[in-house]
């Protein structure tokens, strides 16, 4: 259970007047609330979940690409968000599977990307396109909301997230967690964004470009 038990109170024995008082953070007000509520219910850890904003996948909608560098001077191109957490960079599909958008077909000449046409449904752990429309999207599967959490916590506004992600023995959670933590996948580059495509390059495939970062020897292959 919770180390600091929480109780949720309901109701009031008498009506509030039209000028509802503002809550006050002191012992006297806590006693007032306790004296006036109809009943209370202890909230256990089984009845608590972390929540994230619900963004449901919908055909024809543009979703933002995951980027680590959104800020006041580089806002997300669709929602104008100054930080990643306010951008629409992930979705939940109709089967309660959650995905992060790795690529939305955007570039320096198409800054807002394309409309998403294929609903992601796969559970493979490698980022993949969702269908054959050619919409330019690449999705990374994150997790599936469990049936019990759907019943208890599903709402129009929020997605529930497992409380024990780091210790869960659920096979689906373990597979995603271990894949993300593996030496193979840690610090991989899954997407290269071209801000300026330049001019005058010869057509061809397999041209190598150095990656500048905190490692050594990294290269990407560019097809012109």
What residues fall within each predicted segment?
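Conserved, function-critical positions that sit in or immediately flank catalytic
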Residues: 134-224
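Beta-strand-connecting loop/turn residues
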Residues: 96-97, 187
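Extended assembly-interface regions of large multimeric machines
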Residues: 1-96, 102-108, 114-161
């Amino acid at each position: 259970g919770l180390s600091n038990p929480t109780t949720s109170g309901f109701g009031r024995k008498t009506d509030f007047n039209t000028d509802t008082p503002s809550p006050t953070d002191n012992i006297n007000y806590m006693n007032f609330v306790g004296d006036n509520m109809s009943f209370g219910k202890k909230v256990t850890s089984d009845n608590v979940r972390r929540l994230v904003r619900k963004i449901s996948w919908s055909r024809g909608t543009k979703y933002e690409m995951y980027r680590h560098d959104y800020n006041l001077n580089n806002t997300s191109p669709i929602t104008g968000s100054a930080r990643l957490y306010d951008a629409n960079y992930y979705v939940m599909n109709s089967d309660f599977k959650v995905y992060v958008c790795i690529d939305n077909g955007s570039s320096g000449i198409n800054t807002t990307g394309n409309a998403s046409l294929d609903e992601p449904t796969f559970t493979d752990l490698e980022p993949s396109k969702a269908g054959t429309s050619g919409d330019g999207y690449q999705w990374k599967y994150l997790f599936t909301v469990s049936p019990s959490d759907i019943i208890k916590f599903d709402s129009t506004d929020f997605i529930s997230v497992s409380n024990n992600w780091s210790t869960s023995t659920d096979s689906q959670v373990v597979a995603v967690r271990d894949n993300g933590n593996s030496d193979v996948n840690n610090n991989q580059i899954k997407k290269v964004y071209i801000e300026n495509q330049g001019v005058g390059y010869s057509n061809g495939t397999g041209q190598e470009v150095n990656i500048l970062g905190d490692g050594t020897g990294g290269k990407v292959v560019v097809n012109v």
